[in-house]
Amino acid sequence: MEGYRLDPWASAIRLEYEKLFRYFGIKPFQPLLPEVEKAFGKPHRLMRRGIIFGHRDYEKILEAYRSGERIALVTGFMPSGKFHFGHKMVADQIIYYQKLGFEIFVVIADAEAYAVRRLDRRKIIEIGLYEYVANLIALGLEKNKHTHIYFQTNYETPYYRLIQMFSRRVTLEEMSAIYGDLEPSKIMAALTQAADILHPQLDYFGGFKYVVVPVGADQDPHIRLTRDIAARFENELGLRRPASTYHRFQTGLDGNKMSSSRPEYTIFLTDPVDIAVRKLKRALTGGRATVEEQRRLGGEPEKCTVYEFYLYHLIEDDTQLRKIYEDCRGSRLLCGPDKEYAAELLAKFLEEHQRRLERARDRVLEYVEPPKF
């Protein structure tokens, strides 16, 4: 593991996913697909297509679900920029689990955005409400008694007590081994995230002893720390290690990680449709240097950011997706027509989504109470 460390606060990162299995003990998700189908029915497309690629203790979640146990999902968003398709991948998972009957806890990490990203507090709250909560609503998150959205700085007293208690049983040396160089803001953020993940297990919040956390692979340092903390508080508070799943990054249009800090290579769900389409048509593809070469050798959809939009978001039907893949590999689909088709699907999605988003922005306060200052 020497020389290979994950940074959960980096805005751009390249991961070698195989190393996550080898160095950090993450298990492959694909062998669980038959059990997922037995428990939940047809697996989510992100599961079927290998985008959700790894897990910790997910078999315990499947067993608990089959046994009729109550299960909580916990995940969150740092409101530091506009909501893009990488965020949508997390939202899609939240909505999937809501439909399965999981208790849903979504944290808007405003304390972390303020301390680590050093953004203006009022702007953070505005982004949290009208970018993140509003887009969740527009994508289909329902309001019910089993769904809880909260800001880190405006929650219940037992949650804050957890943060204080956790600080007693974690050493600076231990945190440095996980995260590397640290500053007070990151220590606070890590302990707060542990409370975000573990608080549903307290009786005050429902006593959910089975918790699953879907995250990007770069967030595994938080998961490892949280699992260690849970074990240390098993006797005192009855905490259990949370399960987790890991998904691949949404690639930016230049082939690097999609990020709000790189808007020219990122498609936001609030982009005007013509701008989003223009961005997509400039995207890196898996095409060859010339049309003649592509007709001879075929394309490489594995390297194509446009194909990735099909894979992650734009095409639900696996048979249709397979045809596009094979047509690209077999030189029957060239990059120009492919981008035109992807642009049509993207435009249709954004037009419909943005109509829902306008209505959703009027409803955000039904879902969450913002901080008072």
From Swiss-Prot:
| Name of the protein in its database record | Tryptophan--tRNA ligase
Sequence motif 'HIGH' region, location on chain:
79-87
Primary localization: cytoplasm
Q: Which GO terms describe its biological process?
A: tryptophanyl-tRNA aminoacylation
The EC number(s) this enzyme carries: 6.1.1.2
Spell out the reaction equation it catalyses. tRNA(Trp) + L-tryptophan + ATP = L-tryptophyl-tRNA(Trp) + AMP + diphosphate + H(+)
What does the record give as the organism's lineage? Archaea, Thermoproteota, Thermoprotei, Desulfurococcales, Pyrodictiaceae
Q: GO MF annotations for this entry?
A: ATP binding; tryptophan-tRNA ligase activity
> What family is reported?
Belongs to the class-I aminoacyl-tRNA synthetase family.
What the entry lists under InterPro entries is as follows: aa-tRNA-synth_Ic (IPR002305), Rossmann-like_a/b/a_fold (IPR014729), Trp-tRNA-ligase (IPR002306), Tryptophan-tRNA-ligase_arc (IPR020653)
Source domain of life is Archaea
Q: Which UniProt keywords apply?
A: Aminoacyl-tRNA synthetase, ATP-binding, Cytoplasm, Ligase, Nucleotide-binding, Protein biosynthesis
Q: Where in the cell is it found?
A: Cytoplasm
Which Gene Ontology terms of cellular component type are present?
cytoplasm
Q: Where is the motif 'KMSKS' region annotated in this sequence?
A: 257-261
